């Protein structure tokens, strides 16, 4: 992972955590929002889900195996792209109005990766990218990288949903081949929750030191200090990538 570098940087406003299902991004995003707030940098967690999970539940109630069987591949990708666009737009607007750091659990890159992993065409990806181009690139994007086999084990252990190993492998490749990949801060998410949280904290310390001290804290406080409370175990992801 590239180390955080101090310098003339604006105040941290948007951080995104992305990765395949089972990488732990929901756990880390929730924890990061809490950690930043405790450290005097008020932050809000935003779950930018594409709706695939609850659509899957609706499909099951209607006698279909999953959302794709209900809507078709193209229909599912359209609905997912629209719902995630709306979620991201709402999160960005909320951050702009509140002045709080927006911690994004999934962002535009997740939709691009989902399109590729589900076999979407280049033309469809181009249309989605055109729609998502409205959104600014997060100041920091953490890609939580984990072996697809380990991600599969985690998903099976939590027992709230299911993903095939083949899909997870395709999604992992999709993230790594996105043109945005060189801008990601890649984190080894195969380690414990605590180790991953500490590495994320270490990278952001440079940003927070360069961007100004904690909000509402005395000027004598250590500007880059962030206290890391012990995070809980893996929280079941709320939606697929």
Regions found by a protein language model. Name each.
Residues 1-14:
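Extreme N-terminal, non-catalytic leader segments
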Residues 17:
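Hydrophobic anchor at the beta1->P-loop junction of P-loop NTPases
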Residues 106-174:
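A glycine- and Lys/Arg-enriched "phosphate-lid" helix/loop adjacent to the NTP-binding pocket
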Residues 5, 149-241:
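NTP-dependent small-molecule kinase module
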Residues 25:
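Conserved lysine of the Walker
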Residues 20:
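P-loop (Walker A) phosphate-binding loop of NTP-binding proteins
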Residues 48-124:
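ATP-dependent small-molecule kinase phosphotransfer cores
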């Amino acid at each position: 992972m590239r180390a955080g570098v101090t310098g003339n940087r604006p105040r941290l406003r948007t951080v995104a955590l992305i990765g395949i299902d089972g990488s732990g991004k929901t756990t880390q995003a929730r924890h990061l929002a809490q950690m930043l707030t405790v450290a005097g940098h008020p932050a809000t967690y935003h779950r930018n889900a594409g709706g695939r999970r609850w659509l899957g539940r609706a499909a099951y109630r209607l006698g279909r195996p999953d959302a794709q069987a209900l809507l078709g591949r193209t229909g599912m990708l359209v609905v997912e792209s629209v719902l995630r666009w709306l979620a991201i737009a709402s999160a960005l607007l909320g951050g702009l109005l509140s002045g709080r750091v927006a911690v994004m659990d999934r962002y535009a890159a997740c939709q691009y990766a989902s399109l590729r992993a589900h076999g979407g065409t280049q033309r469809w990806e181009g249309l989605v990218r055109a729609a998502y181009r409205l959104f600014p690139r997060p100041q920091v994007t953490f890609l939580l990288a984990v072996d697809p086999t380990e991600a599969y084990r985690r998903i099976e252990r939590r027992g709230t949903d299911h993903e095939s190993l083949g899909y997870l492998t395709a999604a992992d490749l999709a993230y790594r081949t996105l043109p945005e990949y060189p801008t990601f801060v890649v984190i080894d998410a195969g380690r414990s929750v605590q180790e991953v949280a500490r590495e994320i904290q270490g990278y952001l310390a440079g940003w927070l030191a360069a961007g100004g001290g904690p909000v509402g804290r005395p000027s004598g406080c250590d500007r880059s200090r962030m206290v890391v409370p012990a995070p809980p175990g893996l929280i079941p992801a709320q939606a697929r990538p």
